[in-house]
A protein has these predicted regions:
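C-terminal amphipathic alpha-helical interaction region
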Residues: 525-729
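Histidine/acidic residue-rich metal-binding segments in metalloenzymes
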Residues: 13-120, 124-140
Length: 729
């Protein structure tokens, strides 16, 4: 194995950047060329078929079988112009990845000749095996049927020689088995609820859209080094490795010069993204060595989520071409920053109003304040649901580690905006307001845009921060499907807005004027949600104590965090807003707990294998060298001098012996703990057992191995070290 390490380093020394040729100097010449967007639809579809698609997207009008056949034929003609040979229903099962089965267009004609055909039936629906994907017990092998159904709101696209059709994935009995189905439901729920509230201010608003801008962080490592690290290959993270003498302490990597090989990779990635209509705009070095970020312009949340899933797949494929491996794990290296995926979330009306941006007049600012205050209450009431949506084995290594937001949910608004809310709460009277009081309030509200101009500072320790015209949810992990967080946020927002509107209508029924009713409910909501507002250092120990006194929860135990999906509040949101039914919600919880269990189980097995088969033998080899050295010293030096000269080597032999013994003993204990957990029939008990009795061994065994790495001859150490993984360019 040590030979493989040095071969990898030698191979890396000979790497050169690949030449990447841009299709055209003009981005617009090839942007969206591989997407069946409206421009291509207009060219390849008859007018009536094009109208059927646009009506389905904008109004939800069903597409007839006749129109589906016309659309499928036009889609096939467009795809053939790009040399496509196969098509697939592209969907997002509960695996944090995507799935696809490629079928050719080949069919037999009536006379037995081979023809190429793509019908509306094949476009609209297919039947993959639902039992082979995570399903929480909904589907068994003997009842395996599931359906994929075309999501007309997300355009088809071509990757290499395959036409990919975005679809939802449901069981034969109708339960959702993917991320897209509940995401579409959550977006529809917040659309309706937000539109109803908007119409209290502006009857011209008939729809509200959810926008998402994700920021994808990732690490790159040379493929030769990656292949020499079995833990990276099998788990996505290093299960052992002593910190490099230099890591990120000089803060010289963030926004630094991008290495040429990485630039070539980024350039090709951007070209492929632009062909697929993914509006990537920003690329830069991140804080940790060999860590980078890619970010697009925001889009409709459903399309943005599809694009993020596609980007993660593109990254892996293009990285291989450039002799890299892309690491999307939240914490691939201990001791340096991990990777997240910030979700920039906003709501926008069909009249062009960003509901999280101050308006141009008091009326517009009232609308802004209404939605701002409802976000505060939404997060306060649903902190456990939001945490559950981002809880995972990988993300738990990152959250609360002085590099990412803590597991405590709070909102940062900035002092100026917080003081405005406090002033509104102070000025609004509990009794009937006078005309003068209303005027004073409206004048103060009218000043919001000038107050907020360049005053919304950035608090990097806040998990849910207002950044001027959007909220940035920073707790999501880099490998996660954005849909999980977007489902929770939008469903919770829909529920909160519905409650807000009901409260206002109740006051209006009692004879209170609309404006005054809005002011009163805003005051109540501002006061009730005050504990969720925090402007300070989210990393500090003082905040943990203060958060507890405010009634905010701090759950770092992953299975416990996931169990909050079944709390009354989470159920009232997810089931009450019809995002999930009882069966689907129970299925989600089971899948997430099983996923957590399997990831810890794999890490445990890999660590045990590497420890016993690679590290311990290396330690024994070096120990034998030391013993041979002692024998040589005894032969040369007189006893008294020998004792002095050999003392340090004896101590090192003793140290290595103790650590080898500890490693073997703890691997044995970890294996026994795993066996006990594996015999548990209840998936909840199993997840808790892995968290509490198996996972602690990962750190304790690692500590011994990392110390051995610093004691054993570098020439025989079997695995690439952190300095090589992080600093070889």
């Amino acid at each position: 194995m040590s030979k493989m390490r040095f071969f990898a380093l030698q191979e890396l020394a000979n790497r050169r950047p690949l030449e990447v040729i841009t299709p055209s100097n003009k981005l617009s010449d090839y942007y969206g060329s591989h997407v069946f967007d409206r421009k291509n639809m207009q060219e390849y579809l008859p007018k009536e078929a094009y109208k059927a698609v646009t009506d389905a997207i904008e109004k939800g009008t069903p597409i007839s079988r006749e129109m589906a056949d016309l659309i499928a034929n036009g889609m096939k003609s467009w795809a053939k112009s790009l040399n496509v040979t196969h098509y697939t229903h592209w969907f997002q099962p509960l695996t944090d990845g995507t799935a696809e089965k490629h079928d050719g267009f080949i069919e037999f004609g009536e006379d037995g000749d081979v023809i190429e055909r793509f019908s509306g039936k094949l476009l609209i629906q297919q039947e993959p095996d639902a039992s082979s994907f995570p399903n929480g017990g909904i589907r068994n092998t003997f009842e395996a049927r599931g359906y994929t159904a075309w999501d007309v709101s997300s355009p088809a696209f071509v990757v290499e020689t395959t036409l990919c059709i975005p679809t939802i994935f449901i069981s034969y009995t109708g339960e959702a088995l993917d991320y897209k189905t509940p995401l579409l439901k959550a977006l529809a729920a917040v659309d309706k609820a937000a539109t109803d509230v908007c119409q209290l201010f502006d009857k011209n608003i008939t729809r509200v859209y959810t926008n998402l801008g994700w920021e994808q962080e990732y690490f790159l490592v040379d493929s030769a080094l990656y292949n020499a690290r079995p833990d990276l290959c099998l788990t996505g993270r290093t299960l052992m490795g002593h910190s490099s003498a230099k890591d990120q302490q000089l803060e010289d990597h963030y926004f630094g010069s991008i290495p040429p090989r990485v630039t070539a990779f980024m350039k090709e990635l951007e070209i492929e993204c632009h062909k697929l209509g993914i509006p990537v705009k920003t690329r830069h070095n991140e804080v940790a060595p060999n860590q980078f970020e890619l970010a697009p312009i925001f889009e409709n949340a459903n399309l943005a989520n599809d694009h993020n899933q596609l980007v993660m797949d593109l990254m892996k494929r293009i990285a291989r071409k450039h002799n890299f491996a892309v690491l999307l794990h939240e914490k691939p290296y201990s001791g340096v920053n991990g990777s997240g995926k910030h979700n920039n979330w906003s709501l926008c009306t069909d009249t062009g109003i960003n509901l999280f941006a101050p308006g141009k007049n008091p009326k517009g600012n009232m609308l802004f304040l209404t939605f701002l205050v409802n976000v505060l209450m939404m997060v306060y009431k649903n902190q456990d649901l939001l945490r559950a949506s981002i809880a995972s084995a990988g993300n738990s290594y990152r959250l609360g580690a002085n590099e990412a937001p803590p597991a405590i949910l709070s909102i940062f608004l900035g002092k100026q905006l917080s003081s405005i809310l406090d002033e509104i709460a102070r000025q609004v009277s509990n009794s009937k307001m006078t005309a003068e009081e209303k005027t004073t309030l409206k004048l103060g509200i009218g000043r919001i845009p000038e107050i907020l101009l360049d005053t919304t500072d950035r608090n990097r320790t806040s998990p849910f921060a207002f950044t001027g015209n959007r909220f940035e949810f920073r707790a999501a992990g880099s490998s996660a499907n954005c849909a999980a967080a977007m489902i929770a946020i939008n469903a919770a927002m829909a529920s909160q807005l519905n409650e807000f509107k009901i409260s206002i209508e109740k006051l209006m029924e009692e004879g209170v004027g609309k404006d005054e009713a809005i002011f009163r409910i805003l005051k109540e909501t501002i006061i009730a949600s005050e504990p969720i507002r925090f402007e300070g250092d989210g990393y500090s120990e003082q905040w943990k104590q203060e958060a507890a006194s405010r009634g905010l929860t701090n759950i770092c135990h992953v299975p416990q965090a996931l169990m909050r999906y079944m709390d009354n509040q989470a159920r009232s949101v997810l089931i009450g807003e019809r995002i999930f039914n009882e069966t689907e919600l129970a299925c989600r919880l089971e899948v997430e707990l099983e996923k957590y269990t399997m990831k810890v189980q794999i890490e445990s097995r890999v660590l045990g294998d590497l420890a016993i088969n690679h590290i311990v033998p290396t330690a024994v080899i070096y120990q034998n060298r030391l013993l041979e050295n002692l024998r040589g010293l005894r032969e040369i030096f007189p006893p008294e001098e020998y004792e002095v000269l050999s003392a340090d080597r004896k101590e090192l032999i003793r140290e290595i012996s103790h650590r080898v013994t500890a490693i073997k003993m703890q691997v044995r204990e970890m294996t026994e703990a795993r066996k006990v957990a594996n015999h548990m029939n209840n998936y909840k008990d199993k997840a808790f057992a892995y968290e509490e009795t198996v996972r602690p061994y990962l750190e304790s065994i690692r500590e011994h191995i990392d110390n051995l790495e610093m004691e054993i001859d570098d020439e025989i150490w079997p695995l690439p070290k952190y300095r090589e993984l992080l600093f070889t360019k």
